[in-house]
């Protein structure tokens, strides 16, 4: 379930209910922790990303009015569909939007060979990166139970949209008249 507004009260009930078994209560408490991270309106968790060259940078150092985080796995069918939609999006690919929004495609998993094999699928204007230290997954900085995951951040790295669809991001950017 990807609608946190609906899921959060369910988790709160399960974690407090004496009718819930220990495994379900533990799962609900863990999910509550994930729901609480990177909420809309909060500052997004910073992380280090590694470029194909091996150079490492911090997400918070991206200096554009908007940052679009794409957490993905190149072998994931849903990720491939989202990537294709983004690459053909008239909104995301308009020259004016491209000046305002930096897209960070971030592979958080450990199989670097998979990421390397698919590098050419990421457009040149995007930041193509991976998590060399696997920090995002091991520290659970982001809720990545399901991928792809898209986050739209403002210039201060405040979360504007969390786990959004491409259409929601397009609509947001269009409504901001970028």
Model-flagged regions — what are they?
Residues 1-57:
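Oxidative protein folding and maturation machinery
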Residues 44-45, 67, 147-148:
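Short loop/turn microsegments at loop-to-beta-strand junctions
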Residues 48-49, 71, 152:
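Hydrophobic beta-strand positions
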Residues 50, 127-133, 163:
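Short acidic-hydrophobic, aromatic-tinged amphipathic segments that line or gate anion-handling sites
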Residues 57-86, 102-104:
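Short active-site neighborhood of thiol/selenol oxidoreductases, capturing the structured segment around
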Residues 80-120, 134-140:
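Structural microenvironment flanking redox-active thiols in thiol-disulfide oxidoreductases
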Residues 102, 125-127:
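Conserved beta-strand segments of alpha/beta enzyme cores
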Residues 134-176:
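Thiol/disulfide oxidoreductase modules built on the thioredoxin-like
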């Amino acid at each position: 379930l990807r609608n946190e507004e609906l899921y959060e009260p369910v988790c709160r009930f399960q974690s407090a209910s004496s009718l819930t078994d220990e495994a379900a209560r533990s799962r609900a408490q863990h999910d509550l922790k994930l729901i609480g991270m990177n909420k809309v309106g909060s500052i997004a968790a910073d992380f280090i990303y590694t470029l194909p060259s091996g150079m490492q940078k911090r997400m918070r150092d991206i200096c554009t009015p908007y940052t679009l985080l794409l957490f993905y796995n190149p072998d994931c069918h849903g990720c491939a569909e989202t990537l294709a939609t983004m690459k053909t999006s008239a909104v995301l690919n308009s020259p004016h939007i491209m000046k305002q929004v930096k897209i960070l495609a971030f592979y958080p998993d450990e199989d670097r060979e998979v990421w390397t094999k698919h590098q050419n699928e990421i457009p040149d204007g995007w930041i193509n990166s991976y998590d060399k230290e696997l920090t995002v997954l091991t520290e659970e900085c982001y809720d990545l139970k399901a991928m792809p995951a898209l986050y739209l951040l403002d210039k201060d790295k405040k979360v504007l949209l969390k786990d959004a669809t491409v259409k929601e991001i397009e609509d947001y950017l269009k409504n901001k008249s970028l």
